[in-house]
Amino acid sequence: MRCGPLYRFLWLWPYLSYVEAVPIRKVQDDTKTLIKTIVTRINDISHTQSVSSKQRVTGLDFIPGLHPLLSLSKMDQTLAIYQQILTSLPSRNVVQISNDLENLRDLLHLLAASKSCPLPQVRALESLESLGVVLEASLYSTEVVALSRLQGSLQDMLRQLDLSPGC
């Protein structure tokens, strides 16, 4: 009887079964670092400095504003909205930021899973149905306002992560 493959498998078993979990503190630190990186990328885009994140712009009400208390699910939902907006913009300035938002959402999902509260999948948002019309009318304004508000939201998220937000 040939037991070669079985012996090799049994010999490798201790190595295969040893999986070290990533400490949640490391995930939280990586999340904060990525948020700071995204904020820096937004700062590097010079025209985003001209609008306050609190300023109201007619027709751009669908872009989320600041939220003082954020849960992990609210953070994920907010980032999903910004990601949809940024991927709709033709500007090359926002491609990397959009990719970073996807990575940030993945880190938030890890944080949520560590607290046993998996985040629901975010569907296409109804409030963004009119995005195409708004982009045709005011492409530049949409980019500036979206990036400015995203920056403010990310800074809120950074503060909230220090307080260990709930589900």
Swiss-Prot record:
GO terms for biological process: activation of protein kinase C activity; adult feeding behavior; bone growth; cellular response to leptin stimulus; energy reserve metabolic process; intestinal absorption; leptin-mediated signaling pathway; lipid metabolic process. One of its GO terms (cellular component) is extracellular space. It comes from the Eukaryota. Gene3D superfamilies: 1.20.1250.10. GO terms for molecular function: hormone activity; peptide hormone receptor binding. Key player in the regulation of energy balance and body weight control. Once released into the circulation, has central and peripheral effects by binding LEPR, found in many tissues, which results in the activation of several major signaling pathways. In the hypothalamus, acts as an appetite-regulating factor that induces a decrease in food intake and an increase in energy consumption by inducing anorexinogenic factors and suppressing orexigenic neuropeptides, also regulates bone mass and secretion of hypothalamo-pituitary-adrenal hormones. This is Leptin. It comes from Bos taurus. The gene is LEP.
